[in-house]
Amino acid sequence: MSIDTGSTAGPDVDTAVDPRPPRPLHQRVARPALALGAGALTALSLPPWGFWPLAIIGVMLFEVCLRTAQTRWERVRIGALFGAGWMYLGMGWMVQLTPPGYVTAGLIFSSYHAVAAGVAPAGRWGVIGRPAAHTLVEAIRLSLPFGGVPLATMGVSQVGGPLAPLASVGGVILLTWVVFQIGFVLADAQPGVWAAIRQLRDSDRTVLPNFIGRIAVALVILLSFVAPSGAATGGTLSVAVVQGGGKQGTSAL
């Protein structure tokens, strides 16, 4: 008598597991927290605080978060958190006017930067594409809805800094792009200009996007020095400023 000792295969079971171990909690929290803090630093460059270098530092930290993000959805979340830190703190005075409007406006404007972070290129050309994308959504914010909402803008953050003369060349939009471009270039950690030129001579194109960003910013700044600044006409103009509404808890708007 023979006995079948072979095993009978049961139903197929998918035993595949993700080879990547789950990241520790502090690693999962660090990047979102840094993105939120980067937005807050950007807001602190605005009045009444008004320390203009914080805008560039905030953008640099924002780019550090974006460069280490592994998926598009993660970049979207980072963009939203950066925008939230920037807008909710920068427009904090609005809560005294209309709390629902404050929450809604911050949510809408944060979503602009979430979209920009999601659609901008993620490769080496991100150092050019990302500043352009975030400048574009700021241009949209200054135009839509209802003719635009020029609050907590990057241009206002630079009024007391050396980049302010750029406004005479391209207004707040150009100033916004320069701040974003400087921050993204500095966070890219590429070699100096002369080293980059040597690498380009050796057909190393990895430094090309960063090099283009540096040259573009330098050219715009040089242009601001030679751009016409106008001259006094000798005439006078009387201007009246009226602010309506009740007590708002702010010294000036």
Which ranges hold each PLM region?
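Soluble catalytic regions of membrane-associated enzymes that act on cell-envelope
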Residues: 227-253
